[in-house]
From Swiss-Prot:
Gene3D superfamilies (alphabetical): 1.10.286.20, DNA helicase RuvA subunit, C-terminal domain, Elongation factor Ts, dimerisation domain
Covalent S-S links between cysteines: none
Pfam families membership: EF_TS (PF00889)
Organism from which the protein derives: Bordetella parapertussis (strain 12822 / ATCC BAA-587 / NCTC 13253)
Gene that produces this protein: tsf
Protein name: Elongation factor Ts
Taxonomic superkingdom: Bacteria
Family: Belongs to the EF-Ts family.
Protein keywords: Cytoplasm, Elongation factor, Protein biosynthesis
Record CDD domains: UBA_EF-Ts
NCBIfam families, per database record: tsf
Subcellular location per the Swiss-Prot or TrEMBL entry: Cytoplasm
Gene Ontology molecular function terms on file: translation elongation factor activity
Biological role stated in the UniProt entry: Associates with the EF-Tu.GDP complex and induces the exchange of GDP to GTP. It remains bound to the aminoacyl-tRNA.EF-Tu.GTP complex up to the GTP hydrolysis stage on the ribosome.
Stretches for region Involved in Mg(2+) ion dislocation from EF-Tu: 82-85
Length: 292
């Protein structure tokens, strides 16, 4: 069994917001397996322990562009190493120009985007020059483009959350949808779009919690299904309560406005990226080695 160190307990607490003693107990039960300990906490403490999915550490910015005719748009994520660089005007300008380039040139992937003409060189040579000027690594992580006969709306929150929405209806509806998505971070439009692995994971947790109730099997089955359906309502856009009027779901709001939504793209900076960290002693040793 792996040693249950204070650092391991601290890491689990930061991932889950669970009490320190509960983290230690979970790690002991999981024999030091961090992922298993997190699952144990979810069963014991409920969905508060799922905050790990939303905790990200990579820095960078989201860029958005919508053409003047409102028929094509793009969202892009570009990462850097520190928040300080994310506020650099050259970095911001680079991202905004990349978003426009994606919308107008429709590259197939990051490699194709990197090869496109940009200024006096290419996107890649410009990126390399910017790395040299700023002194930090910069990477184009992902982008998505939408071309539509309908309408597009976008919203960026603090440069860290970006939303692009394809919809039909009044301009105000598009703005409301984009802001709502940024606030609630749905996984999909409806249940059909939710990743099967996410549903399976939620069902597994629900089954373990329901089994601990000691109730008859038929009741346990209903409890599990109820938990899964509740999860799906929480993470699917059309089922969510509208943030500006929680007495309506998004689906009801759209029907009332005579509007519809076809697609949305949601990017959160650093989502799914784990930033490598070193303990203080290691940092001092590395610095000393660098001076030697």
């Amino acid at each position: 069994m792996a040693e249950i160190t204070a650092a391991l307990v601290k890491e689990l607490r930061e991932k889950t917001d669970a009490p320190m003693m509960e983290c230690k107990k979970a790690l002991t039960e999981a024999e030091g397996d961090l992922a298993r300990a997190e699952e144990i906490l979810r069963v014991k403490l409920g969905n508060k322990a799922s905050k790990a999915a939303a905790r990200v550490t990579a820095e960078g910015l989201i860029g958005l562009y919508i053409a003047a005719d409102g028929k094509q748009g793009a969202v892009i994520e570009v990462n850097c190493e520190t928040d300080f660089v994310a506020k650099n005007t050259d970095f911001i300008d680079f991202i905004n120009k990349l978003a426009e380039l994606v919308a107008t040139q429709n590259p197939g992937d990051v490699a194709a985007l990197s090869a496109l003409p940009f200024g006096e060189g290419t996107v890649e040579t410009t990126r390399t020059a910017l790395v040299g000027k700023i002194g930090e690594n910069i990477s184009v992580r992902r982008f998505e483009r939408i071309q539509t006969p309908n309408s597009l709306a976008s919203y960026v929150h603090g440069g860290k959350i970006g939303v692009l929405v394809e919809f039909s209806g009044a301009e105000e509806v598009g703005k409301d949808l984009a802001m709502h998505i940024a606030a609630t971070k749905p996984k999909a439009l409806n249940a059909d779009g939710v990743n099967a692995e996410d549903i399976a994971a939620e069902r597994s947790v629900a089954e373990q919690k329901a089994a601990e109730s000691g109730k008859p099997a038929e009741i346990v089955a209903k409890m599990v299904e109820g938990s899964v359906q509740k999860f799906l309502k929480e993470v699917t856009l059309l089922s969510q309560p509208f943030v500006k009027n929680d007495k309506q779901t998004i689906e009801q709001m759209l029907k009332e406005k005579g509007a519809s939504i076809t697609k949305f793209v949601l990017f959160v900076v650093g989502e799914g990226i784990e930033k490598k960290t070193a303990d203080f002693a290691s940092e001092v040793a590395a610095a000393a080695a660098g001076r030697a």
